[in-house]
Amino acid sequence: MLHHVRPYGHGAFVPNRLLEVTPQFLDAALARATSLGFQFASLDQVVAHVRARGDGPPQLAVTFDDGYVDNLEHALPVLRRHGVPATVFVTPGFADRTSTLWWLDLEHAIAASPEVVVDLGTGEERLPCAGDAQRSAAFERIYWSLRSGPEARLRSTIALLAARAGIDTQATVARLCLDWAGLARLAADPLVSIGAHTMTHPMLAKHDAAVVRSEMAQSRDVIVERLGVPVRHLAYPVGDPGSAGSREFAMAAEL
């Protein structure tokens, strides 16, 4: 499961770098997996193989979350070179520019501020951000504190920090995420299939059942309508046990 594929960006304070690899890394990883005897397959093929208890070489599926511009510009040429299929899980809110990449908004707000003032539930805290070490400490403090609480508080707190720092959060989405025309170009490639990644990229386990069901079903339906492609698979945003669990798995299976 991948997110960004793009040339390496220099800088010591890049807390979200774990979400990116370079095109050269992807190229080397695909070549290495092939040399080890893995057979690349689409998610449909992997599911069929598992259900049939198929023999043969182990299968490996490549997936990308969110629908970034670099998936089209940098990842797809590597996939074509190796003939490797992939599934891109799309969040319509990013394509529509109505949802935000809050984890990047937090990074950008801290990078642009000598100090951040934030209330994490116990009153205002002043966190210095004068150097990379202080920025990293501030990011860890804010990120994990907000991740452990209600998602509404996470999003509103980060939106406030971004606004104070002069960060245009919608411009970030427009710069990094494919719009529907770009997604159509990606989906037109025979190596690419499209999956659903919810409407707004929420941590589903933090929401009631009606919201979860709507996020899943509506994202599928909107993608089918806008791109005219089948959508048979769902990726859960964030993906840790605090964001998706047995309830979400059962609801997805029903849809």
Model feature map: region roles:
Residues 1-233, 240-255:
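Catalytic alpha-helical scaffold of carbohydrate-active enzymes acting on polysaccharides/glycoconjugates
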